[in-house]
Each structure stands twice: as structure tokens, then as C-alpha cells.
């Protein structure tokens, strides 16, 4: 599923102009004494909608007036992505905001956080607890390791986002700093902090990350992806 590509200025405007909502689910006992507005969905004794629209209804409950409120945000500007029609594997617990592009056969594991404007290429895996900041881009058939961070750039609007190429492996807990580009076929070692652009087909490691060798057959074998993990 491809979202419309947004510039930093467009994302800032999107967030700034969005209606801020505190979406809740409320289960109540008794009866509502006032009509339910169109902005609120009522299914039996359950209400879905913005707290500002639901709170007045609860003040007019008849009988025992008991209710339970479930919420996960406050004055949120960006909803979560509708994942129903993605041709990808998204595991429970992944947090993916709206205006994110996820291409075919990508995998997003539990605990991953994908911010607005990020792009994930076909066949790419985002592992457990990895973070893709705003506008971060990952190419095709890459792997972003558990706990890795691709720093986001929404402000300042003039800054460039992180761009990871095709067939790249970013190791666990590595950090790629704002504006850095990692070339196709390269490997970022676990725990590395990448502060400068990385050319194609090299291995970088350390803090700050430096080139330690070119990709060879042994490295390719160690970093090969498993297609079966991307089957749907």
C-alpha cells in the first residue's frame, strides 16, 4: 500500500491543521438520556468517538451511571494506519501511524514503531522494537534489526531524511543519524552509530561507524535473507 509521498512541510501542515482527538471506547450501564451525535458510534452499550463528544452523554446516564473508559492517546493529531488491506505481514503490537507506505511482502514485527511519512520497500523486514522516524525510507529486501533506530526528520523542514537502500542489513541496536544514506547491499553492524553516508556493498561498524571491509561471499552468506519469512 503506497501513501502519497509527503514533504516535511506537508507533514508539518498535516499535523498542525489536523483536528486533535482523544479517541475512546466507553462501555456503560443504564440508558443514555440524550441523543447520540453523528460523531459518536454506539453499538449496544458501547460508545466509540472523541472524549469531548462522549463525556456529555455520560453525564446524563440514567440508573447506576457506571462506565469504563479505554483510551490510548490525548489530543492526537495523527491516527494509526488502516492495515486491513496491506499485502504485508504486520504482527500485533507494531505501532504504525497514518501516511506510511508499506509495500508487498514487507514484514513489521511486534513492538516496531513506524512514524508518519516513513516508507518500507517490498520484502523488507522491520524487526522487533525497531524505530523508523518520520520520513525514514528503507528500500527493497532489506532487514532493520531489533532495536535499531533510523532517526526521523520532520523538523527542521529543510533537513534530509534517512535513506536505506535495497538489500541492506542494519544490525540490532544500530543507530542511523538524520540525513544519512546507506547504499545498496551494505551491512551496518550491530550497535554501530552511523553519522556519515555509507557507500554500496561495504560493512561498517563502530562508534562512529567506519568501513571495515567490502562485502564478500562469506558476509553474503551470513546476512542472507529468508524468503519464507516473507510469504503470505
From Swiss-Prot:
GO terms for MF: tetrahydrodipicolinate N-acetyltransferase activity
Gene3D superfamilies found in the cross-reference section: Hexapeptide repeat proteins, Malonyl-CoA ACP transacylase, ACP-binding
UniProt keywords, alphabetically: Acyltransferase, Amino-acid biosynthesis, Diaminopimelate biosynthesis, Lysine biosynthesis, Repeat, Transferase
Pathway given in the UniProt record: Amino-acid biosynthesis; L-lysine biosynthesis via DAP pathway; LL-2,6-diaminopimelate from (S)-tetrahydrodipicolinate (acetylase route): step 1/3
EC number assigned by the record: 2.3.1.89
SUPFAM superfamilies registered for this protein in UniProt: Trimeric LpxA-like enzymes (SSF51161)
Recorded superkingdom: Bacteria
Annotated function: Catalyzes the transfer of an acetyl group from acetyl-CoA to tetrahydrodipicolinate.
HAMAP family in alphabetical order: DapH
Listed PANTHER family: 2,3,4,5-TETRAHYDROPYRIDINE-2,6-DICARBOXYLATE N-ACETYLTRANSFERASE (PTHR43300:SF10), ACETYLTRANSFERASE (PTHR43300)
Similarity comment: family membership: Belongs to the transferase hexapeptide repeat family. DapH subfamily.
Protein name: 2,3,4,5-tetrahydropyridine-2,6-dicarboxylate N-acetyltransferase
Organism: Streptococcus thermophilus (strain ATCC BAA-250 / LMG 18311)
Gene behind this protein: dapH
Amino acid at each position: 500500500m503506497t501513501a502519497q509521498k509527503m514533504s516535511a512541510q506537508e507533514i508539518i501542515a498535516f499535523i498542525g491543521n489536523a483536528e486533535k482527538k482523544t479517541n475512546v471506547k466507553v462501555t456503560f450501564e443504564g440508558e443514555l438520556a440524550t441523543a447520540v451525535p453523528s460523531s459518536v458510534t454506539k453499538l449496544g452499550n458501547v460508545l466509540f468517538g472523541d472524549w469531548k463528544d462522549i463525556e456529555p452523554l455520560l453525564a446524563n446516564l440514567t440508573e447506576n451511571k457506571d462506565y469504563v473508559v479505554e483510551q490510548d492517546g490525548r489530543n492526537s493529531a495523527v491516527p494509526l494506519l488502516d492495515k486491513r488491506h496491506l499485502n504485508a505481514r504486520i504482527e500485533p503490537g507494531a505501532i504504525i501511524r497514518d501516511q506510511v507506505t508499506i509495500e508487498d511482502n514487507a514484514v513489521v514485527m511486534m513492538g516496531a514503531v513506524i512514524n508518519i511519512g516513513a516508507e518500507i520497500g517490498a520484502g523488507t523486514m522491520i524487526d522487533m522494537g525497531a524505530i523508523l522516524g518520520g520520513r525514514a525510507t528503507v528500500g527493497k529486501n532489506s532487514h532493520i534489526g531489533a532495536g535499531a533506530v533510523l532517526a526521523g526528520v520532520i523538523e527542521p523542514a529543510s533537513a534530509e531524511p534517512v535513506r536505506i537502500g535495497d538489500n541492506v542489513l542494519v544490525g540490532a541496536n544500530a543507530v542511523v543519524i538524520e540525513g544519512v544514506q546507506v547504499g545498496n547491499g551494505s551491512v551496518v553492524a550491530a550497535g554501530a552509530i552511523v553519522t556519515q553516508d555509507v557507500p554500496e556493498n561495504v560493512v561498517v561498524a563502530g562508534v562512529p561507524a567506519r568501513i571495515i571491509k567490502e562485502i564478500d561471499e562469506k558476509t553474503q552468506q551470513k546476512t542472507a535473507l529468508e524468503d519464507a519469512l516473507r510469504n503470505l
